[in-house]
Swiss-Prot record:
Pfam families found in the cross-reference section: GIDA (PF01134)
Cystine connections: none
Function: Catalyzes the folate-dependent formation of 5-methyl-uridine at position 54 (M-5-U54) in all tRNAs.
The protein's name in its UniProt record: Methylenetetrahydrofolate--tRNA-(uracil-5-)-methyltransferase TrmFO
Organism: Mycoplasmopsis agalactiae (strain NCTC 10123 / CIP 59.7 / PG2) (Mycoplasma agalactiae)
Length: 427
């Protein structure tokens, strides 16, 4: 029986173990939480959740809901556990204790899983290994990963800017840059700027389970849009002022959008990284006239979040380019969110199995949410890599005119067919 090592028994590590055990591997699982917990871990069970509502929509007309359905077809431990422990279906809310208990009991009772409860400090490439230690790895392992991928490819924090769908913005309020065809300026008059400013400074802030996270971010040079605004109105005005746009009554301030290098459907709202809660972010973004009816694909976040530049250091199957016996999965790869982290672990484990059986790599295509998400983090912009969560902008669009429920149902039906074909051909 072949042996594979998994580092970390969080969401992605637990999923990776399950997928490998199903494929008849002897799995060594390293987990340190019974000896040394990170600041948000509260017990010794596997797959700790910080919140009970972490699974978002269950509807297949939502990209996150469709991702869960794709994962059900791929027999995901995490989604099986969430369905078992659910207390509400839409959005999918779970009882955290039941969820963690389901996963822990299954894995601990499996005869082919060897649990090693100690800190994993030195990466040993003599054994095929999946590193899945999540956003809060131990300092020792952080240093080991830095040595493995290079310090410039390892990040301790993220500052993710909101993304809107390019085709959904109102071009009547947009000026294109004369210097860079990837830049777009959303214009605001003075009253619109004042309204935006007041929304930002009065917005409700997300309270992290990690103590002093916002202070930690600020101390390391990461400033949110609300921090800038609360410093002074003039400082926000300076941030939202483009040198190449002449200031007039209708261009008192500008919000800059930048087209993503990998996916031209994505426009990032530059400098809008934030810890503001999503309902308030939604109101703030919609207050920009050009974005009043925009489809928001993802919201801004700022986290203490360990992740590697996957597009730079991983092959297109989550395998380290410089060492084929090492794979990465979960939040560490830039798949952002519990479900997304688990999704990457499924695909990673499938490809570990294929690597050890000398079979070609296998990842679902971009007509699926799971495939488009994995392909994005593995092939995206190497220079400005940011974590990504499931959204419709990643998925091949079928040239939809509108992302209404009818259009999204078509995308969902196609994705389910594609996943079934992927399973038939590869699993």
């Amino acid at each position: 029986m072949k042996r594979v090592r998994v580092i970390g028994a969080g969401i992605s590590g637990s999923e990776a173990c399950y997928q490998l055990l199903k494929r008849n591997y002897l799995v060594e699982l390293f987990e340190v939480k019974s000896i040394k917990k990170n600041p948000i871990q509260t017990n010794d069970m596997f797959a700790n959740l910080a919140y009970s509502d972490s699974f978002h929509s269950n509807e297949i007309t939502s990209a996150k809901g469709l991702l869960k359905q794709e994962m059900r077809l791929l027999d995901s431990l995490i989604i099986n556990a969430a369905d078992y422990a659910k207390v509400a279906n839409e959005p999918l809310l779970v009882d955290r204790y039941k969820f963690q208990e389901y996963i822990t009991n299954y894995l601990r009772s499996h005869q082919n899983l060897k649990i090693i409860e100690k800190e994993y400090i030195t990466i040993d490439d003599s054994v095929p290994t999946i590193i899945a230690t999540g956003p809060l790895s131990s300092v020792n392992l952080e240093n080991e990963i830095k040595n493995l991928v290079g310090e410039s490819n390892f990040n301790l924090f993220d500052k993710v800017e909101p993304i809107v769908l390019k085709s959904s913005i109102n071009l009547n309020y947009v000026q294109k840059s004369a210097l860079d065809d990837k830049l777009f300026y959303c214009t605001l008059n003075k009253n619109e700027f004042e309204y935006l400013y007041n929304l930002i400074i009065s917005a409700e802030i997300f309270v992290s389970p990690l103590p002093n996270e916002i202070k930690l971010l600020h101390d390391n040079g990461f400033r949110s849009i609300e921090t800038v605004a609360k410093s002074s109105k003039n400082e926000l005005k300076n941030l939202l002022q483009a040198n190449e746009i002449r200031q007039t009554e209708n261009t008192y301030a500008t919000v800059l959008l930048r087209e993503d290098d990998y996916n031209e459907n994505f426009l990032r709202i530059v400098n809008f990284q934030t810890s503001i809660k999503i309902p308030w972010q939604n109101e703030i973004i919609k207050a920009v006239p050009a974005l009043a009816n925009a489809l928001i694909l993802r919201y801004g976040v700022m986290h203490k979040n360990d992740y590697i530049n996957s597009a730079n250091v991983l092959d297109d199957n989550f395998q380290l380019k410089s060492n084929p016996n090492i794979f990465f999965a979960g939040q560490l790869t830039g798949t952002d969110g519990y479900v997304e982290a688990s999704a990457s672990a499924i695909i990673c484990a499938i490809n570990v199995d294929r690597y050890l059986r000398n079979l070609p790599k296998a990842i679902p295509n971009n007509k699926t949410v799971i495939g488009s998400l994995c392909n994005y983090v593995l092939i995206a912009n190497k220079e400005d890599f940011q974590p990504m969560e499931a959204n419709w902008g990643l998925v091949e669009s079928m040239n939809l005119v509108s992302y209404n429920n009818e259009g999204k149902k078509k995308l969902s039906d196609r994705a389910i067919s594609e996943i079934k074909e992927f399973i038939k051909q590869n699993l």
